[in-house]
Amino acid sequence: MAMTGLNTAGSDRDYDTQSLNRELQDKGFLLTTTEDLINWARTGSLHWMTFGLACCAVEMMHTSMPRYDVERFGVAPRASPRQSDVMIVAGTLTNKMAPALRKVYDQMPEPRYVISMGSCANGGGYYHYSYSVVRGCDRIVPVDIYVPGCPPTAEALLYGILQLQRKIRRTGTITR
């Protein structure tokens, strides 16, 4: 039974939408928004680019191998930043390499995401107190997901990629 009245306009609209949705589903149609459709497509077709600077890059390669096969989740590697949605920064970022990282990030199309992989990329790691090390790649580019570890396992990176997909589904791409 539907509620009616001055203060229940939202409830009436929700009830009408739900009944319309059920009726269309019975006939084989799907009722959704454009934003939900875009988010669904974006999470299923992420293209990542490696920015491997040290030993974490080896674990990044393991993620693409047959044991973990990250491509089954709709994530595929790309060689060019212009074709990439996600940049995975893995390893120690030095002051000399920081401008190159920013340049590659700026070449990526919007919306773009960054995964910081390993202790060195997250906060400088073992070389934190060195004069030539940037203490976290988040000082150069905005980071969406941090994957801890030295080096993090392929499972940890895979979990980080899945968390990024959840974040995209939750926050959306139009409002980012």
Curated annotation (Swiss-Prot):
Recorded catalytic activity of this chain's protein: a quinone + NADH + 5 H(+)(in) = a quinol + NAD(+) + 4 H(+)(out)
Known cofactor(s): [4Fe-4S] cluster
Principal EC category: translocase
Keyword NAD: yes
Binding residue positions for [4Fe-4S] cluster: C55, C56, C120, C150
Subcellular location: Cell inner membrane
Cross-referenced InterPro entries: NADH_UbQ_OxRdtase-like_20kDa, NADH_UQ_OxRdtase_20Kd_su
Gene Ontology CC terms, in alphabetical order: plasma membrane; respiratory chain complex I
Cofactor mode of binding and number, as noted: Binds 1 [4Fe-4S] cluster.
Domain of life, source organism: Bacteria
Alphabetically ordered keywords of this record: 4Fe-4S, Cell inner membrane, Cell membrane, Iron, Iron-sulfur, Membrane, Metal-binding, NAD, Quinone, Translocase, Transport, Ubiquinone
NCBIfam families named in the record: nuoB_fam, PRK06411.1
Subunit structure: NDH-1 is composed of 14 different subunits. Subunits NuoB, C, D, E, F, and G constitute the peripheral sector of the complex.
Protein's job: NDH-1 shuttles electrons from NADH, via FMN and iron-sulfur (Fe-S) centers, to quinones in the respiratory chain. Couples the redox reaction to proton translocation (for every two electrons transferred, four hydrogen ions are translocated across the cytoplasmic membrane), and thus conserves the redox energy in a proton gradient.
Listed name of the protein: NADH-quinone oxidoreductase subunit B 1
